[in-house]
């Protein structure tokens, strides 16, 4: 255990203890203070005799902040107007001093640019190797002609089994069947595009929810004999659900297999998984055949058999999936897993193993564990609709070019009843790496621990209870503690088997800000 600043009253580590005394910063109760103008998250800050009112922008004046957000092909900038924060699109802004203003007056070319950007985000992942584009081009050629051949084969099969002698009837049957498959594939495409990053960050939750969807699709297919006039509609709905479930299974399969491969034998683990799937599926097929043979002399019982067995078999199916997911110990880092690791580190100075984190993380069907806590932590850009305290807006004004991230607070409405809840936001800069993500989250966990400790000591702790001096000291000392912990924390995480090279973030968490040096 170490402490670089023995005189610090913010963070103190016990030498020998299994349950630590949380680092607490007790906010002074006197009101006569000198406020700071520079509210940076870095260690070197300057205090000046400026009051909070001197730095608040008048309501009739909008001050540009040096923070630019690029999202979905649009460029936006934060502005402070009065005591509120606004995020305005600056694509049309005629300002040659910054390279972010595109200056395209032609609406047609702007539409082309936005369309191409949307198509790129829809089809391509954000971080891939250089040869990925060439691979996708050849994959396009392969899949287009393969799909066309399947259509021709389907039409030929309908003719072979005697569905009508006329061309129109065979074509109609083939068209209806292809329509069913086409809707399923289209839904699968839309689903995977909308949840691309969720397959990494919420793998267990997405996989179990799609398994429930697959089970429901079986129930829909069982209803087709009851409503034969709606066969195409029911079959299409069931196929859509199956395609969505299949897309999730394929997208998450490699990550699941990688978690079990301890000797870089991913190919062997995947091959054995396919063998297991084929053998287990054949056993299920044999069970269904035996049950049908048992009731083959009673047509009424045989017709009712699927409806009787469906809830029983579905329960066992989902139970097996749920219990199996609990035994998957993912070594990749996400924001939620990092929170669990860093909280354990702050309290016990130990990094938990992937198995321990997996047990605490669970499946997460009711949402992430961190979002239900006091002062939940969020990574992303600031929401202008949320209430941002004045001291946080002043921190954004004084942001410097050396900062790889900044930390602010917000008051947002959550849940069905839209109850306001205080939270902490981490805004990462463009080019931030995994070290920046881990350091910023560790610093924020230190801040939350201090705020939570003060909340228990007082009946209520709000934004107004924090002065600029409080927040500056809190961010300064927490960042110092996070930086001091970096080497020891990273070493223990690697020893426990965590992959620290990258931190997997959701689409909203991947949004970065760009620091505009011309605004200084």
Swiss-Prot record:
The record's annotation in InterPro entries points to: RUS_fam (IPR006968), UVB_sens_C (IPR055412), UVB_sens_RUS_dom (IPR054549)
Locations listed in the record: Membrane
Q: Which superkingdom?
A: Eukaryota
Its placement in the membrane is given as:
Multi-pass membrane protein
Q: Which GO terms describe its cellular component?
A: chloroplast; membrane
Task: Provide this UniProt record's keywords sorted from A to Z.
Answer: Membrane, Transmembrane, Transmembrane helix
Q: Does the keyword Transmembrane apply?
A: yes
Q: Which residues cross the membrane?
A: 275-295, 301-321
One Pfam family from the record: UVB_sens_prot
Q: Which GO biological process categories is it annotated with?
A: anther development
Predominant location category: membrane
Q: So what family is this one in? A: Belongs to the RUS1 family.
Instruction: Please identify the protein, giving its name as recorded.
Output: Protein root UVB sensitive 4
Q: Which organism is it from?
A: Arabidopsis thaliana
């Amino acid at each position: 255990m170490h402490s670089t600043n023995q005189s610090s009253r913010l963070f103190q580590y016990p030498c020998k203890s299994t349950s630590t005394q949380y680092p607490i910063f007790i906010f002074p109760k006197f009101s006569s203070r000198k406020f700071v103008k520079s509210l940076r998250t870095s260690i070197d800050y300057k205090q000046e005799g400026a009051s909070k009112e001197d730095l608040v922008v008048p309501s009739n004046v909008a001050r540009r902040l040096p923070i630019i957000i690029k999202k979905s092909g649009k460029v936006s900038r934060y502005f402070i107007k009065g005591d509120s924060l606004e995020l305005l699109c600056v694509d049309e802004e005629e300002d040659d001093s910054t390279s972010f203003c595109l200056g395209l007056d032609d609406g047609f070319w702007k539409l082309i640019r936005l369309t191409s950007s949307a198509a790129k985000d829809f089809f391509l992942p954000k971080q891939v190797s250089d040869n990925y584009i060439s691979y996708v081009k050849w994959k396009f050629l392969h899949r287009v002609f393969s799909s066309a051949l399947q259509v021709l084969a389907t039409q030929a099969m309908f003719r072979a089994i005697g569905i009508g002698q006329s061309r129109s009837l065979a074509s109609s049957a083939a068209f209806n069947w292809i329509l069913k498959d086409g809707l399923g594939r289209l839904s699968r495409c839309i689903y995977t595009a909308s949840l691309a990053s969720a397959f990494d960050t919420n793998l267990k939750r997405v996989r179990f929810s799609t398994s429930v969807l697959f089970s429901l699709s079986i129930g829909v297919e069982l209803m087709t004999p009851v409503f034969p006039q709606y066969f195409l509609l029911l079959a299409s709905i069931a196929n859509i659900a199956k395609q969505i479930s299949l897309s999730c299974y394929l997208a998450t399969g490699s990550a699941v297999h990688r978690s079990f491969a301890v000797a870089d034998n991913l190919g062997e683990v995947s091959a054995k998984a396919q063998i297991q799937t084929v053998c287990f599926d054949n056993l299920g097929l044999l069970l269904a055949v035996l049950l049908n043979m048992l009731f083959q002399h009673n047509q009424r019982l045989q017709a009712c058999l699927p409806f009787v067995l469906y809830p029983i078999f579905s329960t066992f199916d989902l139970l097996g999936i749920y219990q199996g997911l609990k035994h998957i110990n993912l070594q990749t880092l996400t924001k939620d897993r990092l929170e669990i690791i860093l909280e354990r580190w702050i309290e016990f100075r130990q990094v938990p193993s992937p198995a321990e984190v997996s047990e605490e993380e669970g499946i997460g069907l009711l949402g992430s564990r961190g979002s239900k806590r006091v002062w939940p932590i969020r990574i992303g850009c600031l929401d202008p609709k949320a209430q941002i305290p004045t001291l946080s807006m002043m921190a954004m004004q004084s942001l410097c070019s050396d900062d790889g991230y900044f930390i602010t607070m917000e008051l947002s409405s959550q849940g069905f009843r839209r109850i306001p809840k205080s939270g902490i936001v981490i805004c990462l800069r463009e080019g931030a790496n995994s070290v920046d993500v881990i350091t910023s989250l560790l610093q924020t966990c230190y801040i939350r621990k201090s705020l939570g400790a003060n909340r228990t000591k007082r009946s209520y702790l709000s934004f107004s209870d924090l002065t600029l001096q409080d927040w500056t000291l809190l961010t300064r000392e927490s960042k110092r503690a996070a930086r001091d912990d970096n080497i020891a924390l990273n070493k223990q995480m690697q020893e426990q088997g965590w992959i620290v090279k990258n931190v997997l973030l959701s689409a909203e968490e991947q949004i970065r800000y760009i620091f505009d040096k011309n605004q200084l």
